[in-house]
Curated annotation (Swiss-Prot):
One GO cellular component term noted in the UniProt record for this chain: cytoplasm
Chief localisation class: nucleus
Pfam families, A to Z: HMG_box
Chain residue ranges for the region called Disordered: 1-45, 137-161, 514-575, 726-753
GO MF annotation terms: beta-catenin binding; DNA-binding transcription activator activity, RNA polymerase II-specific; DNA-binding transcription factor activity, RNA polymerase II-specific; DNA-binding transcription repressor activity, RNA polymerase II-specific; RNA polymerase II cis-regulatory region sequence-specific DNA binding; sequence-specific double-stranded DNA binding
Originating species: Homo sapiens (Human)
Gene3D superfamilies: High mobility group box domain
Name of this protein: Transcription factor SOX-30
């Protein structure tokens, strides 16, 4: 920060070569402080300073008397203004100095050398001891009276932009003015004024210590330069403050022309400053709020709320002297065997009655807390008899219940969703990671499931799978997925899970195979239609029994949702009289490549052609969390969503046959394109191949509508091989072997469902 230098008229002379001084950037400032009112005993001092900007006027001889000024721009500088020129004002100046010394006895009042030789007196700068004190400034409007009250101490900034120039105005050229640094901070350590107007004598006051930060004026009035003479008389008195009685008429006749008054005063710490005008937008006022410490009583959690007396209660009664008979280890009504007592329980059982009798107002919980405190106070030697007794009880308990293992009560355990261990308990699970052989990229994910039901165990390569059923992810989600079961008795297959980002299809394109066509025999037409309104459950059960076949297919579709009622077109059931072809091993799996099926809803009619469709087949949300393990969560839904699958699976433990399925991601918009150029059927024609090599086709006409066809063509051979359920999406193909049990129990459970 540049040091402020006063400029004496008429010729400004700089102290040393310096950057060009800044012009005056402010209008008139006025700072006045009078004596504090007698009602404020805490106010220690008051000060007044009047500053106004005006250049180009000469110093007149009619200056106001008894004006004492000391403006310190920096902590180590004091500006000494010239001596009053009028001889008749010396008496008033001396009286003012005497009054000032009453307030500040530690000050030294020095008179500058008189200009007897006609030389112009120049203000001088003298270093003094820096003081770390602050002065608060408050902006006020100029009223009819110039009296301004002041406070003791404080600190405040009156604006975001501190004024760079403070000027003194007189009847002639300006006596002196100051300029701060380019950052706009004007610091004053000591400002003392004694202003007298006419006959009204204002008592001199002093601002003890302060930092003045003024607001930058809005208009530029004068363009003045700053200059100063170096200190020549060397008035330096250590740490004492230097006060000079200057000319007194600089503020007299022009006080009425002041436009922007500014009162500088001290305020107590933490005081709130309020501006009468519009406060600067960038000003941030911080107020210290005194916090009274409130004593907080920290009550120990181990101490009872009621004072329990233990003076007359014996707390070291031995188990042999207690006279309490040994109670047999009892079971509760559920057959739960209680644990044997430990040492503390043995001790508490003996002393609880006596402690409760001595404190009848205490409840059982408070008695227990006090017993715990008293037990901790005992020494190890005093606790030893109770540990010995607890060991005897434990040995007796082991003899009575040799295979007993402590188990917490089931009612106290937190219930979780059905886990994989509960679903597939007692089954063998072989997880094999492989890579897809052939990938046909699609735009958006759907899910394809391939689960053939075979009489004889057949292991297909990953790329050589049986017909696929694509499971969509519905756009309108509902909290209950549809479950589709296909348990089969004597079949044994493998479940394969495919990477969701890489859908798997046969390595060879789907082809037509020559052979006796059984389309007339196996192509089924619906015999009835059903109009369904949600949330009415839709059930479709196919219980086809063939005496010559050992496999029985059961399919159940349970729809449960809480969506608003919406009417869907017909869903046709499968007639029970439909014949099902006998399954036989494929002689050459790598030669006969069955083409993948379309959407499973196409089993019942026209599949949707758009990504947004009604969830008529799988209305529930598909729970496919991104996980590397396919069964890290329950494979048939997770979370708190209502689903009938976990309950159903609880009946199917150890009853599933081995199935083979591939879970993959396909296109969501379901634009079922021809998988081979050789397919001459419609866009979504599917070829369902018999295990003997006979292929029969199901052709469906697509009208682009979203609803189902009232009279769909259903392939019971495909429905027989369906075993679908949403599962976790893995990062690689997983194989899980699941075993099964007899047929009658499955039929019984499915009939109940």
């Amino acid at each position: 920060m540049e040091r402020a230098r006063p400029e004496p008229p008429p010729q400004p002379r700089p102290l040393r070569p310096a950057p060009p001084p800044l012009p005056v950037e402010g209008t008139s400032f006025w700072a006045a402080a009078m004596e504090p009112p007698p009602s404020s005993p805490t106010l220690s001092a008051a000060a007044s300073a009047t500053l106004a900007s005006s250049c180009g006027e000469a110093v007149a001889s009619g200056l106001q008397p008894a004006v004492r000024r000391l403006l310190q721009v920096k902590p180590e500088q004091v500006l000494l203004l010239p001596q009053p020129q009028a001889q008749n004002e010396e008496a008033a100046a001396s009286s003012a100095q005497a009054r000032l010394l009453q307030f500040r006895p530690d000050l030294r009042l020095l008179q500058p050398p008189t200009a007897s030789d006609g030389a112009t007196s120049r203000p001088e700068l003298h270093p003094v001891q820096p003081l770390a004190l602050h002065v608060k400034a408050k902006k006020q409007k100029l009223g009819p009276s110039l009296d301004q009250s002041v406070g003791p101490r404080g600190a405040v900034e009156t604006g975001p932009r501190a004024s760079r120039v403070v000027k003194l105005e007189g009847p002639g050229p300006a006596l002196g003015y100051f300029r701060g640094d380019e950052k706009g901070k004007l610091e004053a350590e000591e400002v003392m004024r004694d202003s007298m107007q006419g006959g009204a004598g204002k008592s001199p006051a002093a601002i003890r210590e302060g930092v003045i930060k003024t607001e930058e004026p809005e208009r530029l009035l004068e363009d003045c330069r700053l200059g100063a003479e170096p200190a020549s008389n060397g008035l330096v008195h250590g740490s004492a403050e230097v006060i000079l009685a200057p000319t007194s008429g600089a503020f007299g006749p022009h006080q009425q022309d002041l436009r922007i008054p500014l009162t500088l005063h001290t305020v107590p710490p933490g005081a709130r400053i309020q501006f009468q005008g519009a406060p600067p937008s960038e000003l941030i006022r911080l107020t210290k709020v005194p916090l009274t410490p409130v004593p907080t009583k920290m009550q120990s959690l181990l101490e009872p709320s009621v004072k329990i007396e233990t003076k007359d209660v014996p707390l070291t009664v031995l188990p042999s002297d207690a006279g309490i008979p040994d109670t047999p280890f009892s079971k509760d009504r559920n057959g739960h065997v209680k644990r044997p007592m430990n040492a503390f329980m043995v001790w508490a059982r003996i002393h609880r009655p006596a402690l409760a009798k001595a404190n009848p107002a205490a409840n059982n919980a408070e008695i227990s807390v006090q017993l715990g405190l008293e037990w901790n106070k005992l020494s190890e030697e005093q606790k030893k008899p109770y540990y010995d007794e607890a060991q005897k009880i434990k040995e007796k308990h082991r003899e009575e219940f040799p295979g007993w293992v402590y188990q917490p009560r089931p009612g106290k355990r937190k219930r979780f969703p059905l886990s994989v261990s509960n679903v597939f308990s007692g089954t063998t699970q072989n997880i094999i990671s492989t890579n897809p052989t052939t990938v046909y990229p699609y735009r958006s994910p759907t899910y394809s499931v391939v689960i053939p039901s075979l009489q004889n165990p057949i292991t297909h390569p990953v790329g050589e799978t049986s017909p696929a059923i694509q499971l969509p992810t519905p756009a309108v989600q509902s909290p209950s997925p549809v479950t589709l079961f296909q348990p089969s008795v004597s079949s044994a297959a493998q479940v394969a899970v495919q990477d969701p980002s890489l859908p798997v299809y046969p390595a060879l394109p789907p082809q037509r195979f020559t052979g006796p066509s059984q389309t007339d025999t196996h192509q089924l037409h619906s015999e009835a239609t059903h109009t369904v309104k949600q949330p009415t459950p839709v059930s479709l059960e196919s219980a086809n029994r063939i005496s010559s076949s050992a496999s029985t297919a059961h399919a159940r579709f349970a729809t449960s949702t809480i969506q608003p009622p919406r009417e869907y077109s017909s869903v046709s059931p499968c007639p029970r009289s439909a014949p099902i072809p006998q399954a036989s091993p494929i002689p050459h799996p790598h030669v006969y490549q069955p083409p993948p099926l379309g959407h499973p809803a196409t089993l019942f009619g026209t599949p949707p052609r758009f990504s947004f469709h009604h969830p008529y087949f799988l209305p529930g949300p598909h729970y496919f969390p991104s996980s590397t393990c396919p069964y890290s969560r329950p494979p048939f839904g997770y979370g708190n969503f209502p689903s009938s699958m976990p309950e159903c699976l609880s009946y199917y433990e150890d009853r599933y046959p081995k199935h083979e399925g591939i879970f993959s991601t396909l296109n969501r918009d379901y634009s079922f394109r021809d998988y081979s150029s050789e397919c001459t059927h419609s866009e979504n024609s599917r070829s369902c191949e018999n295990m003997n090599g006979t292929s029969y086709y199901n052709s469906h006409s697509h009208s682009g509508e979203e609803n189902l066809n009232p009279v769909p063509q259903l392939d019971i051979g495909t429905l027989e091989n369906v075993f679908t359920a949403p599962t976790s999406t893995p990062s690689s193909i997983q194989q899980v072997n699941v075993t099964d049990s007899d047929e009658e129990e499955e039929e019984k459970v499915l009939r109940d469902l």
